[in-house]
Amino acid sequence: MSAAREESRVPGREPLTAPVEDYLKAIYTIGKGTGAAATNEIAQRLALAPASVSGMVRRLADQGLLAYERYHGVKLTESGRRAALRTLRRHRVIEAYLAKALGYPWDRVHEEAERLEHAASDELVDRMAATIGEPEVDPHGAPIPTKDGSVDETVYTSLAELVVGASGVVVRVADEDPEMLRYLGELSILPGKRITVKSRAPYDGPITLGSGRHEVSIGPALAAHVLVAPLADRAGKRG
């Protein structure tokens, strides 16, 4: 048995397979850590048929990794949550290592990490993290769980929610779409960047953003994939 599979073992159970780890990670992400995920949301995220997802959900519930209540969605149990966080740690450390140590662009690290996360042992991932200075976030701003399973679950504001005149610092960008990441990179909408909403066109028109002397316009659908920490002096939400 490989070290990676040995370390993915839940006490009293067989080692978790890559598909099971993918399910747990998806449910954690959809439910924002502690909330519920609908089976159709899981199916959409994993690009699977809803019937296949329903069957797997029942099996994982029988294994004690999920709590499932009809019409109320799926939640991770404590053991399921721990397993999801182990997988997320491997994924996000690998992303950070690829970017910092190997110079990968931020739009390519997600797919590489998806392939590597199930094969890498926890020891290898810990060494990767140490080599690049124990990063707290991945290249897209997502928090990296610690070795003991703790993680920053702060809920941030979507850029699409900021009102005209509000400022914020970009903290996280959705990482699933490489083309979107490349485009945001070209616009310099990156974690750590301070931006101000200059104007909003009506009827879901473009949002004009300013950063220093630089201005760009993006649509609200794209802005919804960017999370910001509003700056208290001028921050606000659309209401």
Where are these regions (language model features)?
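Key DNA-contact positions within bacterial/archaeal DNA-binding proteins
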Residues: 51, 107
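Short, hydrophobic-biased segments on the C-terminal half of alpha helices
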Residues: 57-58
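Extreme N-terminal segment that seeds HTH/winged-HTH DNA-binding domains in transcriptional regulators
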Residues: 1-47
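Basic, amphipathic "hinge/linker" alpha-helix immediately C-terminal to the N-terminal HTH DNA-binding motif
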Residues: 72-91
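A short, conserved structural fragment
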Residues: 61-69
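Mid-protein regulatory/catalytic core that forms ligand/cofactor-binding pockets
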Residues: 117-224
